[in-house]
Amino acid sequence: MELALPGSAYIYQGEELGLPEVADIPWDELEDPTAFNRVRDQIEKGRDGCRVPLPWKAGTPTFGFSPATKHEGAGVDASQAGDPCEKPHLPQPQWFADYAVDREDTDSGSMLNLYRKALGLRHEWMTADTTLTWLDCDRSSGKPDGAEGHIGGTIAFRRANGWASVTNFGAEPAELPAGDILLVSGPLTDDGRLPQDTTAWIALG
């Protein structure tokens, strides 16, 4: 939905991989000053969980973030060449391998390839006209969406040159407007409706 809105888009590192925050970094390996603030000491871990080096290659010691061994030059003399490189500044959990770029790159259904397709469509379909028109299917479902009891619903809007974004936050599948589906973030229901927490981009008929 964010990429369908007017204006610039901001993608935080790892978002394009579907990478979760690393919430269990040991206290003695944190770097964020928030974790060591006298008022919050060992109460709030700060932002380091979102700053862990990205996984590029699943089968390497640092998931491709840095070389496995040192190479001569740039502060490394011949006697150090071949030694193991230092660990990354923040620890990478083993489950990072499941989100590595080289794995997602070859998976047509991965989050990485979804982002690539969305960015390509954004470039193709978005114009300088920032007009956004709410569609009739933009509505509250009147039912909790599962997120702390909030009422869910559908957010749907039309962009200037005839395409629309529909996101279903409601508990029940939502009907889609007529048109050709350009992109969908997850499978539709058997009868073609949009499930909860799923977005579709549609070239309106």
Tell where the protein language model's regions lie, with residue ranges:
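Buried hydrophobic-core signal for structured, non-transmembrane domains
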Residues: A164-N168
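Loop/helix patches that line or flank the sugar-binding groove of alpha-linked glycan CAZymes
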Residues: M1-W163
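C-terminal beta-sandwich/jelly-roll accessory domains of carbohydrate-active enzymes
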Residues: F169-G205
